[in-house]
Regions:
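Conserved RNA-binding domains used in RNP assembly and mRNA/RNA metabolism
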Residues: 2-149
Length: 149
C-alpha cells in the first residue's frame, strides 16, 4: 500500500458531519448550536445560527454603519443591499432540501470569538462570522469562554 492511499479517504467524516449540522441549522430561523472550529490553525468559537438570522443581522449592522452618509447614498445603498440580501438570506425551499438538490457549504456564527496565540478577537461585543466548511480542520460542540483577567 502506497503512502498516498493510506492518507487519502473518500469519506471525510469531519466535513460530512459539519454539512449535516449546516443542513439542519442553516435553513432554520431559530436553531443554533454552540461550536468551536479549528480553521487552518485559528480557533473560531461561537453559536452556529441559520443563514436568514445571519443575513438579517448583517443587514442591520450595514444600515447602521451607513446612516451617517448622505440621504441619497443611504437610499441607494439600502436598495442595493436589500436586493442582494433578499436573494441570499432565504434558505432553499423544502423540496430542494428533501431531494438533496441543495448542499450547504458554509457555517454562520453569532457571538464569534477568534483566538490566536496571544489574544481573543474581538474582546467584547457581538460578532458575526461566516466560513467555508471545507476550510475546517477540526471542531467540537461547545464554545470556548475566555477567562476574565
Amino acid at each position: 500500500m502506497s503512502s498516498d492511499s493510506r492518507h487519502k479517504s473518500k469519506f471525510d467524516g469531519r466535513i460530512g458531519l459539519l454539512k449535516i449540522f449546516a443542513g439542519v441549522i442553516n435553513p432554520s430561523e431559530k436553531g443554533e448550536i454552540p461550536l468551536t472550529l479549528n480553521v487552518h490553525g485559528t480557533i473560531v468559537s461561537g453559536m452556529m445560527i441559520g443563514m436568514k438570522p445571519y443575513y438579517e443581522q448583517m443587514g442591520k449592522i450595514f444600515v447602521d454603519a451607513i446612516k451617517r452618509s448622505s440621504p441619497e447614498t443611504v437610499s441607494v445603498a439600502k436598495k442595493e443591499f436589500k436586493m442582494v440580501f433578499d436573494k441570499i438570506k432565504e434558505p432553499p425551499n423544502p423540496k430542494e432540501l428533501e431531494d438533496g438538490e441543495f448542499e450547504f457549504n458554509h457555517i454562520f456564527m453569532r457571538n464569534a470569538k477568534i483566538y490566536n496565540a496571544i489574544q481573543v478577537i474581538p474582546y467584547r461585543g457581538t460578532t458575526y462570522w461566516i466560513g467555508k466548511i471545507e476550510s475546517v480542520d477540526g471542531f467540537f460542540l461547545g464554545m470556548i469562554h475566555p477567562l476574565e483577567t
